[in-house]
Amino acid sequence: MSHYHNYIVAAMDMLIGDPDVIDPDEIKPDTKKKADFLCIPIQYLDKLGEWRHELSSRGEASKRLINSMGGMLSYLNNHPNSENAFTLANGMKVVFREVPHSIEAHSTQLAISLGQELKNKLASKKGSVAIMTGSDWMVAKASAAHIDVARINPDIYTGRTKVNLPLDAAQLWTKDHHISEAEWKDIFPGKNIHFNEFVEFEIKNFGQAQGGYSNIGRFTYDNHGNPAVIPLKYVKFASPSYRNIRPITNVQAMYFEALLAPVDEIPIVVFSGIFGTGKTFLAVAAGLNGVGYHTTKPDVPYDRIFICPRDSALGKDVGFLPGSLPDKTMPMAMPIIDNIYDVMKIIRDTAGTAKYPADEEKSKDDSGYNSSKKRNRKHAKPQNNDNAMVKKTSSGTISKEVLDITNEYFEFQPLIYMGGRSISNALIYYDEFQDVERFQARELVSRIGNGSKIVITGDPSQLSNPHLNRTSNGLNYIGTKLADKPYAAIIGCTDEDEIVRHWVLREVAKALK
């Protein structure tokens, strides 16, 4: 193999992290020289064959990689000593090399040993060797062995961009409130913009003088059906009861715009945000407004709010827990219940009264409403007494009022019971999606039915699934795959200054960086 000049050695995390990265145009070591061959320690095949039976992203990735190899594995079985190169479907040439059997197949040392061997062979020749990995640990080991690294660190799509709008173009926005796609290309040549991407304009001598979030736009279709950056349209609740629930930061304004947009305009919302940015709170508020809680709207978009509890994202079975399914899921539902209470409290403060009279249209002997009545109902207003009418549950003491609202509007379903479901006319909320495997993410998104909106949130910095990382998790997977799709809004937030839950959290986030 002395005539081969430039090599990329595959670390195992590169193979199972996402086989899509095996692309000639993407595989470039730090030396900026394009690789001629991708070298894989042959012992990795044993692990790929073992892992392909797993119900996990690792198993799925192993199957995809094996399938992409076509007849390569069959040929290797018949020619175990062959050093011929094989070509994958995407054109990348691959060679398998034996590494001493004393090294275990799953060891990170396999790639290091193969890299050192190839580097020694090239000592007197022109060429390069680099180890391809996304692991910080592998980068450190390669550096210690004086081997270059081809780092897998794909950019994470945030769905937002900040630009300085030239003064001569400022009137297009501040006066016309409209920048067409052609005008965008003229103002910002070479800067691409995706559908449903949010734009924060910085305009010298203008600022935010017009108030609100007038400096934020969204790239979508205008009233004439033409692609353009237009102002936010849905960022405020129409119901007076919800008028004090409003965005505090720019990223919340973007998230809220997507939440309140009609289902036929944005049926999928993905918000990847640092803790304390209002991911769950705003989703709960939008959901309660959407089912008609404390509003007088004659028609509402949703019949229910569907929640996949956070602990079930890790695939935890709840079957062993005592009680009915609602009893089993109640401990997982507490983050939602906390936010229901917070939303109710703001609604009370908005009304400015200690106690609301019951709606005249709701008779005293009416114990509730069934699902067929949900679209044309009025609801009793909450009593402004946080300690009144409480009920003790296995998860603690919950206000009966909050519990009644939870039972009336919310449905909790663990991940393991989601297969085959079709959820219509609902706001479907998936939290902690950073702990969801990619194959699970596809299954969950496919549960959407007519009239439903899916809201997916999570924080990649708080991974609990040991098999995932910040790029291979379900949250980033869905956000990346749906970027630039007109039916999806993808929003990312990593700025500590956009934390709103408590001022001290901003300082904590900065200290823990």
Task: Map each language-model feature to its residues.
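Conserved helicase motor core of SF1/SF2 NTP-dependent helicases
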Residues: M14-G70, D136-W137, K141-A145, A150, ...
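Active-site-proximal, substrate-binding regions of enzyme catalytic domains
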Residues: H3-A130, D136-Y242
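Polar low-complexity intrinsically disordered regions
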Residues: M1-H5, P24-A35, N120-S128, D148, ...
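Hydrophobic residues in beta-strands of the RecA-like P-loop NTPase core, especially within AAA+ ATPase
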Residues: A10, Y429-Y430
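Small/flexible residues
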Residues: T220, F306, R377-H379
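Short mixed-charge
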Residues: P80-A89, D342-L403
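Intrinsically disordered, low-complexity sequence elements enriched in Ser/Thr/Gly/Pro
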Residues: S56, I216, S371-R375, I499
